[in-house]
Structure formats: C-alpha cells, structure tokens
Amino acid sequence: MKTNHVLIGFLAIMAGIIGFAVFFQEAFTALLVHPAVYSHARFIHIAAATLFFANAVAGMLWEQRSFASGSKAVILHTYNTVALLDALFSSPLIIILLLAGLSLSFNWGELWQVGWLSVSFLLFLLSGIFWVLGDIPTQYKIKQLISGLKPGDQVLPDQLIRLLRLRWWISMAGVLPLLAVFILMVYKPEIPAVADWFR
C-alpha cells in the first residue's frame, strides 16, 4: 500500500477543514458548538488524544528496539508498519482531535483568549510540524535505504544508522509537546493566553 497517497489524502482533508473554518467561520462554529455535541466531543477528544499519544510513544520505542536488533529485515518491517500506522491510524486521529478539540474550545470561549487552551493548540501544531517536516521524510528515506540493501548485506550503511539515530530525536521533539498538551488539558493552569503575547 502506498502510504504517502493516504497521508496526502488526509492532509487534503485537514486543509479542507481549515479552509472551511476560515472562510465559513460562522457555519463551522455553529456545527461545533451545538450543545448535544459537547459530551460526545469530550469523550472522542480524550480517546483520540490517548490513542494518538500512545501510538506515537509505542512507535518510538518499537523503532528503537528494531534498531537495537541490527537486523535489516526487522528494521524494514518496523518502518513499513510504523508508516502504515501513521497513514491509517495517526492521520485520521489528528483530524478527529482537531474537530473535537475545536468543538470543545468553542464551548470554553475564544480559543486564543484561554491561556492553557491556546498554548495547547500551538503545541499541537508544533508537534504536527515536527511530524510532517521531520518524521515522515526520514521514515521514507529509511525505508528507501533499507530496501536498497542487498540480501547478503550484514552491516547497515552509516547514512542509515545516522538517520535511525536522528529519528529518535525527531520523534522525541514531536512527542514532548504532546505530553505538555496532556498536562495542560488535565490541569488547565491559569497562564497567559496566546492573544496576550502580542499586546
């Protein structure tokens, strides 16, 4: 399965949702603020956030274990599976998180006026930037390098080893903001809103 086509499809859906929210803000807000939606949105958001975070951490650990094995077959299988999970599992979860999170945020007040909420949203976006610009490209480069190895190759090339090590740090950079989002979401501290940063 060509996971990059699936990822592009989900990115297009996300762009469409963002476009709809920007150009048809009143209609978008009316859909998400409906009182009957709140409890469902909260449950869906908590479940999706938990699954998304767990998938990210499990993927990091699984990749680290495959790298420690030194086996080309194990590493290739791991990266193929992680890429598949990112395309079929993480991408839809991101869309669900975005919609449920926006629905909840509209019920809390103006997104950029609530401190913990606005900072959480920025951290979620930061994690997404690491995922799109760092995680996905290195994942595909690793798959490409591993599939180019000859069946008898016992030693992994230096470029591949460097990428495998780099991915740990890229993944960590993407997961740490999510951990901070969880903390903000649970404790809801009184912190300055993002809108106040620019006044």
Regions flagged by a language model, labelled:
Residues 1-199:
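Polytopic transmembrane helical bundles with strong interfacial aromatic enrichment
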